Amino acid sequence: MPIIQSVERALQILDLFNEQATELKITDISKLMGLSKSTLHSLLKTLQLHGYIDQNPENGKYRLGMKLVERGHFVVGSIDIRQKAKGWLTELSRRTGQTTHLGILDGREGVYIEKIEGKLAAIAYSRIGRRLPVHATAIGKVLIAWLGEAELNALLEGYQYTTFTPATLASREALMSALAQTREQGYALDSEENEQGVRCVAVPVWNHESRVIAALSLSTLTSRVDDAELANFREQLQQAGLALSRALGYPA
């Protein structure tokens, strides 16, 4: 496997910091890395630009940045919620025969962090770790529907409404209308908007602060599940979403 030297060096810099070395001068880093200060300068500035390295204004020493704290909370939180959600997803897939997912928001995209394959609806394109367009998936709509106005506007600034099927929402206006409907009814639908032949429904997962931190979804094959059956599945999904939310401290 080819190694990208600049990336490896950047990671090695991050690994230098520990409980005994919370702050380091560039001369310290230079000695430990065996690199010139001029070479290190560009690496440190790049890490600093992206928030992974910070510089103490009082002494000029470098230290780990808050971006690592954010990423750490993201990883720990996703592991915890994944463990809690798996039981509900497994039971829902067993009862319905459909494929269920757990997704979270990461930047401008959703990400599947759990998937339980249904015996009656094998969804080949979905997998744990797959990134999801928020405008074209039920999970994506749920994950952004309850964001604050400023946060949502920032997320959608310059957003690309890529068309995946004839049913894909192709504009901000169409998406905003769908998000309003999602908030009103408490769930989102994806009717072949991301993948032809597949319909999905998703519901929010709330935490103890009454904030949406994830979404549960159920995916069906359009040819095998009619509207009435999908509505039944949606009700079961909503029950699972509420149960998981309460397990996470949601006060409802």
From Swiss-Prot:
Regulation of its function: Activity may be controlled by xylonate.
Q: What is the lineage of its organism?
A: Bacteria, Pseudomonadati, Pseudomonadota, Gammaproteobacteria, Enterobacterales
The record describes the protein's role as: Involved in regulation of xylonate catabolism. Represses the expression of both yagA and yagEF operons. Binds mainly at a single site within the spacer of the bidirectional transcription units yagA and yagEF.
Alphabetically sorted, this entry's keywords are: DNA-binding, Repressor, Transcription, Transcription regulation
The identity of this protein, by name, is HTH-type transcriptional regulator XynR
Q: Which GO terms describe its biological process?
A: negative regulation of DNA-templated transcription; single-species biofilm formation
Tell me what organism the protein belongs to: Escherichia coli (strain K12)
This protein's record includes keyword DNA-binding: yes
All copies of domain IclR-ED, residue ranges: 81-250
Question: Which molecular-function annotations from GO does this UniProt entry contain?
Answer: DNA binding; DNA-binding transcription factor activity; transcription cis-regulatory region binding
Q: Which residues lie in coiled coils?
A: none
Which residue ranges carry the DNA-binding annotation?
25-45
Give all residue intervals belonging to the HTH iclR-type domain.
4-66
